[in-house]
């Protein structure tokens, strides 16, 4: 995991101690050092920051898959001359709505534990406050849960 936030790094180390963590400025070298074939097989770009799109494909090995889940404020540029020879596959998009029922069923059945990720809970009547906290990354928020009742 390449992460900038010290709070999120602490969270990852506490809840997922077997996961390797690095910071953005060391990410490319970190991936090369920890892979056997010149980069990552799969890269998930979830940050959506100014330099994270480039960092994502730079960390990918030739013939890798780069999945972009992030939303960007500005259009991203594909620097094709720099990418030449990598033969990357790009996949884009957010959560697939048709999988939501299955994901919720797995969470309800205890097959997926979201407990460590949900740092804040709000009733539906306070959804504007929930969005404000999440959007502005206040109070160490990771994910927000909204209760309908």
Residue locations for each model-derived region?
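C-terminal substrate-binding/catalytic core of Rossmann-like NAD(P)-dependent dehydrogenases/reductases
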Residues: 28, 33, 37, 73-120, ...
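Adenosine-nucleotide cofactor-binding segment
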Residues: 1-53
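Short, well-ordered coil/turn elements that cap or connect secondary structure elements
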Residues: 15-16, 61, 85, 109, ...
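Short glycine-/small-residue-rich Rossmann-like dinucleotide-binding loops
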Residues: 48, 70-71
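Conserved acidic E/D residue at the C-terminus of a beta-strand in Rossmann-like folds
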Residues: 3, 70, 94
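C-terminal hydrophobic helical "lid"/dimerization subdomain
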Residues: 4-6, 54, 58, 97, ...
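Glycine-centered, small-residue-biased loops immediately flanking beta-strands
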Residues: 64-65
